[in-house]
């Protein structure tokens, strides 16, 4: 199969799931077990998190390592010096993908997150399917289609790399604010305190710092910046990277809106001027 085949399946999956996310709270995290529809069928949040996120880098590496079309793309790329440059571009894009998922699949759930709420098996299966299709489409694209057939300006590439780096760092920074807050909340465990709310086996408090001054889910917003930067670096013809970015928006925006509503409902003193995910707008 070619990258376009997996990309078509990814499009069908995202377009099919998006309407569901508008009306159903994805049963994981602070919104777990809040619907009778998902009252049973939960698995360990930490184990599920690691396994479902590992699918993306593993399928990505499989696509690159075992694709027979890789060598056949190289002769059409020009002389040796041009080929070296093009291969370096592929390596940078692959590095962006793998570095993100190293943090997402291993560092965050195993080293940083103090507690992880259970997740419903439907969330796990959906994430596995998305990560499989996304990992295969992007991995195969890098070795089959060659983003370098449509040269990207140096300025665009470096702007994209800078945005990716800022988004990646911002995502981790705001995640760590939430982790630190949860650690301190779990130690103080005072459900009668209006600034502390219990959900499942975790205690939550109002987060502050960084972009939390403006939005409830800055970690999501930073991840959008991260993958938009990756798309810029890949070039306008890099459709799998564009769809990864678009999928992040379609699948995370409803979650951010529901999380914002949860904060406003649970905390009487929640900042009224704080938006859900985009500063000053939404």
UniProtKB/Swiss-Prot annotation:
Pfam families in the record: Steroid_dh
Recorded coiled-coil stretches: none
Keywords: Endoplasmic reticulum, Membrane, Transmembrane, Transmembrane helix
Cellular component annotations (GO), alphabetically ordered: endoplasmic reticulum; endoplasmic reticulum membrane
Family listed: Belongs to the steroid 5-alpha reductase family.
Domain of life: Eukaryota
Species assigned in the record: Schizosaccharomyces pombe (strain 972 / ATCC 24843) (Fission yeast)
Molecular function GO terms recorded: 3-oxo-5-alpha-steroid 4-dehydrogenase activity; oxidoreductase activity
Protein name, UniProt field: Uncharacterized protein C9.08c
């Amino acid at each position: 199969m070619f990258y376009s085949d997996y990309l078509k399946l990814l499009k069908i999956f995202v377009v099919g799931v998006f309407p569901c996310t508008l009306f159903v709270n994805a049963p994981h995290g602070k919104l777990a077990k809040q619907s009778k529809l998902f009252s049973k069928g939960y698995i360990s949040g930490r184990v599920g998190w690691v396994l479902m996120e590992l699918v993306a880098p593993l399928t990505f590496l499989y696509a690159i390592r075992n694709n027979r079309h890789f060598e056949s793309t190289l002769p059409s790329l020009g002389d040796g010096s041009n080929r070296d440059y093009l291969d370096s571009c592929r390596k940078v894009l692959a590095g962006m993908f793998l570095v993100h998922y190293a943090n997402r699949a291993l560092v965050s759930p195993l080293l940083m997150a103090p507690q992880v709420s259970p997740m419903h098996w439907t969330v796990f299966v959906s994430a596995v399917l998305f990560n499989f299709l996304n990992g295969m489409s992007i991995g195969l694209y890098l070795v089959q289609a060659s983003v370098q057939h449509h040269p990207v300006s140096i300025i665009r590439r470096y702007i994209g790399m800078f945005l990716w780096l800022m988004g990646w760092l911002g995502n981790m920074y705001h995640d760590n604010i939430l982790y630190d807050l949860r650690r301190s909340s779990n130690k103080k465990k005072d459900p009668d305190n209006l600034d502390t709310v219990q959900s499942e086996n975790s205690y939550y408090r109002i987060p502050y710092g960084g972009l939390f001054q403006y939005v409830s889910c800055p970690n999501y917003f930073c991840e959008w910046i991260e993958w938009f930067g990756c798309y810029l670096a890949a070039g306008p013809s890099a459709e799998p990277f564009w769809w990864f970015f678009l999928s992040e928006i379609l699948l995370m925006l409803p979650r951010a809106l529901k999380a914002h509503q949860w904060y406003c409902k649970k905390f009487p003193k929640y900042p009224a001027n704080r938006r859900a995910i985009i500063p000053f707008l939404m």
